[in-house]
Amino acid sequence: MAARTDNSIVVNAPFELVWDVTNDIEAWPELFSEYAEAEILRQDGDGFDFRLKTRPDANGRVWEWVSHRVPDKGSRTVRAHRVETGPFAYMNLHWTYRAVAGGTEMRWVQEFDMKPGAPFDNAHMTAHLNTTTRANMERIKKIIEDRHREGQRTPASVLPTELHAQQLLLLAASGRLARIVHVLTELRIADLLADGPRHVAELAKETDTHELSLYRVLRSAASVGVFAEGPVRTFSATPLSDGLRTGNPDGVLPLVKYNNMELTRRPYDEIMHSVRTGEPAFRRVFGSSFFEHLEANPEAGEFFERFMAHWSRRLVLDGLADQGMERFSRIADLGGGDGWFLAQILRRHPHATGLLMDLPRVAASAGPVLEEAKVADRVTVLPGDFFTDPVPTGYDAYLFKGVLHNWSDERAVTVLRRVREAIGDDDARLLIFDQVMAPENEWDHAKLLDIDMLVLFGGRERVLAEWRQLLLEADFDIVNTPSHTWTTLECRPV
């Protein structure tokens, strides 16, 4: 069965600049981290052939191939395909550009099928292409936005302008936009538009809503690229709205719902309390900590665990479960939720066994997950609290996935020291799957999540230097070079 990837990013720059930079083939070695050479071979009426040559891969191998590319600036589209397909039965690419709030949206779709006997199947290649595409998009975005800023650095650019006012207005109104997206998510509009454009009257009938009111909400969402308005009040899907479809593994549907729950929304009314005191506003609003509230409210707790499981799946798709785990035979996942992440590691490495430790309410949900992955016979499930119960000994890898950012430095050091005591003199590794914040002035979702940590949990996101200091206090040293956003910090005891 054929495979497909679909990724997009918004570049804060005008279309002309985005188009010119991304379609300058001979400059691609600067844009794309994996390309060493790009050469245009021949040009015809509708396009051109060009050759790409990669930098050496992890095994020292260099790859090259010829593709045909047809750019159409008028329609803001590019179509391309590989002429020399290599391990692919075929590879087709479609790029589109669209003006949206905040700049130019650049969308890349790749459709392909692997040849029988190729070293990777469609699923592995899909995961690889998604990872490299997202990384390259972020790289290209930064290059173009840096060039755009350089071009704008005139005395006039520092004066208040209509553009600056509109951007600030959009930020100030973002709370309204979040509620609009949530309402459209609850109505499953993205699912209803999955098969093509529809009139608002049809959508209102299917969702049991007031037609004019639904139109006004959809019109507002379309103004920022979430759905697109067509003639006579029809609406269609967009790359942004596709992220709201049910079952989309690359979507953000659970995040939208999570951000609009009472337990995440109400504490933001008291954010000033957190800013003035450094304490989480959650306790001021609900009278307990976030996790105490989940224990007392099982329905909210179950949703939170489902939400965390969704992000576990995203991390596996992004390759974090493949970070050299073949080295380890006994793996302890501390705070591992329902065990899905650990199960994917064990499925990939049948020689290994695992331990899953989490609070009793959470650990109780692991059985079906481990059974479905066919690894239940290789996992010990240990209900417990790693702050108060003994951390198991005798493992050669200890994992924390999305756990330590929930806690203050003081609390995080406490649990890290308990892991260090459990390791003792063993030759074990601590693997932290978490976020490393990008440098100052760069967009990074972790910088928004850091405010969640402040307001809801009393935890924090960290830059690399802060991670190093935190781990040093617990007698660990980082031995790899972590990237930004979600990444792996591999630590050895010292």
Curated annotation (Swiss-Prot):
EC number: 2.1.1.-, 2.3.1.235
Main EC class the enzyme belongs to: transferase
GO biological process: antibiotic biosynthetic process; methylation
Chain spans, region Methyltransferase: 169-494
Comment on pH dependence: Optimum pH is 8.0 for methyltransferase activity.
Annotated consequence of substituting residue 108 to A/L: Strong decrease in the production of the first ring
Pfam families the UniProt entry points to: Dimerisation, Methyltransf_2, Polyketide_cyc
Temperature dependence (free text): Thermal resistance is enhanced at low protein and high salt concentrations, is pH-dependent and denaturation is irreversible.
Keywords linked to the UniProt accession: Antibiotic biosynthesis, Methyltransferase, Multifunctional enzyme, S-adenosyl-L-methionine, Transferase
MF terms in GO: O-methyltransferase activity; protein dimerization activity
Region (Polyketide cyclase): 11-140
Active-site residues, record numbering mapped to chain: 67 (proton acceptor), 69 (proton donor), 82 (proton donor), 405 (proton acceptor)
Pathway where this protein functions: Antibiotic biosynthesis; tetracenomycin C biosynthesis
Residues that coordinate or bind S-adenosyl-L-methionine: 358, 384-386
Quaternary structure note: The tetracenomycin polyketide synthase (TCM PKS) is composed of a ketosynthase complex (TcmKL), an acyl carrier protein (TcmM), a cyclase (TcmN) and a probable second cyclase (TcmJ). TcmN is a homodimer in solution.
Protein name stated in the entry: Tetracenomycin biosynthesis bifunctional cyclase/O-methyl transferase TcmN
Organism: Streptomyces glaucescens
Lineage: Bacteria, Bacillati, Actinomycetota, Actinomycetes, Kitasatosporales
Name of the gene this protein is made from: tcmN
